[in-house]
Amino acid sequence: MNVLPCSINTLKGLYEISGVEVGQHFYWQIGGFQVHAQVLITSWVVMAILLGSATIVVRNPQTIPTDGQNFFEYVLEFIRDLSKTQIGEEYGPWVPFIGTMFLFIFVSNWSGALLPWKIIQLPHGELAAPTNDINTTVALALPTSVAYFYAGLTKKGLGYFGKYIQPTPILLPINILEDFTKPLSLSFRLFGNILADELVVVVLVSLVPSVVPIPVMFLGLFTSGIQALIFATLAAAYIGESMEGHH
């Protein structure tokens, strides 16, 4: 009977799953501050990829665009169209902000699946996509919230706060709560999806041969791109809403 060996193999697989490191962090002590080193390292890598690729492509623009130029122009047009659709005709000043958010999240999400972070050994925890950490997603959501209020105050002045009593003052607490829950929904949605995707891949790799999780990894790449698009779209929509009025 092969029941006993199968049971032993199953228990070994479950033991490996239980060893997946979630919530274990490696810190640097800089002055009087404790810094989350894992997020800083991976974020620096992502920023280096973005800045390096952009510098290489745009430092010597050609009259006849190269493939790299065409790609970056397509990305820029995509971000412009997204901003214009959600914000309206006054989208211009917000293109850099929306574009920065989209590109950083997109490359961060993909880095979790494409870059071999695990070959870098740390005393505690392990490297993963920057967006796999709640600190990163909150840090991305808070500037979005600030931009939301800034856009409304710039466009309408103090009259912007009149939206909180529309259509009736009874809704004042709900309208205030709505604005302060937007950054929470942005941060937790992104964090939850990226963390869940990486955990699913780790679990499947622990239980089944390495070939089987490949379709799941491709699905993860697709959903990672979708999450970046959702974040950028909602950020632009919130800014557009604050400039146009409460819906």
From Swiss-Prot:
Membrane topology designation: Multi-pass membrane protein
PROSITE patterns: ATPASE_A
Domain of life: Eukaryota
One of the record's GO cellular component terms: plasma membrane
TM ranges: 38-58, 95-115, 134-154, 199-219, 220-240
Record keywords, A-Z: ATP synthesis, CF(0), Chloroplast, Hydrogen ion transport, Ion transport, Membrane, Plastid, Thylakoid, Transmembrane, Transmembrane helix, Transport
Gene3D superfamilies on file: ATP synthase, F0 complex, subunit A
Localisation: Plastid, Chloroplast thylakoid membrane
GO molecular function: proton-transporting ATP synthase activity, rotational mechanism
Keyword Transmembrane: yes
Record-linked SUPFAM superfamilies: F1F0 ATP synthase subunit A (SSF81336)
HAMAP family: ATP_synth_a_bact
Cross-referenced NCBIfam families: ATP_synt_6_or_A
Family: Belongs to the ATPase A chain family.
General function of this protein: Key component of the proton channel; it plays a direct role in the translocation of protons across the membrane.
Complex formation: F-type ATPases have 2 components, CF(1) - the catalytic core - and CF(0) - the membrane proton channel. CF(1) has five subunits: alpha(3), beta(3), gamma(1), delta(1), epsilon(1). CF(0) has four main subunits: a, b, b' and c.
Protein name: ATP synthase subunit a, chloroplastic
